[in-house]
């Protein structure tokens, strides 16, 4: 997985900085460096991103309340480029650029399709959820199995769910 993620990062950074490619880089950063769920990414609004304080406010799975997360420096950089390009002031952070629904909020299905096309091009066998799995596995390793800390940073309510990841790693 490390090699695939490095290949994906290299591919994204080598792309010309077109609006579509900037959107792809931002999506990949939120999945890879933040471990966000697909639903958390598509629910993001422009107002949820605070680049000055390097935070984002995430509306979790099945929740209406938003919780702050710290943004990785790479995520801050690509989000800044993305927002400077699109100049969105409010509303959905990620929007469709297809002809029949241009400007609408991206759906989880459309995000999966975007990522699936890139994976196919790079011959990566994976899924969008694989990013989250990778992120959580990294957290478990860096916190040496301290699942309370991992649950905080992964926004996993269930320690039992994290034990599944932990058992795979240890």
Question: Positions of the model-derived regions?
Answer:
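Conserved catalytic core of the tyrosine transesterase superfamily
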Residues: 1-170
């Amino acid at each position: 997985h490390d090699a695939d993620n490095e290949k994906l990062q290299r591919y994204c950074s080598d792309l010309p900085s077109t609006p579509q490619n900037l959107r792809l880089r931002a999506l990949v950063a939120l999945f890879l460096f933040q471990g966000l769920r697909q639903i958390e990414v598509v629910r993001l609004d422009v107002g949820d991103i605070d680049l000055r304080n390097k935070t984002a406010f995430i509306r979790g799975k099945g929740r209406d309340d938003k919780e702050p997360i710290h943004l990785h420096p790479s995520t801050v950089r690509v989000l800044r480029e993305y927002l400077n390009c699109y100049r969105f002031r409010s509303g959905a952070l990620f929007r469709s650029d297809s002809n029949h629904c241009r400007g609408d909020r991206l759906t989880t299905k459309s995000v999966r399709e975007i990522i699936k096309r890139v994976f196919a091009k790079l011959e990566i066998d994976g899924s969008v959820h694989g990013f989250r799995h990778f992120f959580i596995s990294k957290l478990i390793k860096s916190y040496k199995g301290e699942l309370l800390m991992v649950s905080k940073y992964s926004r996993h309510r269930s320690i039992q769910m994290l034990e599944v990841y932990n058992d795979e790693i240890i």
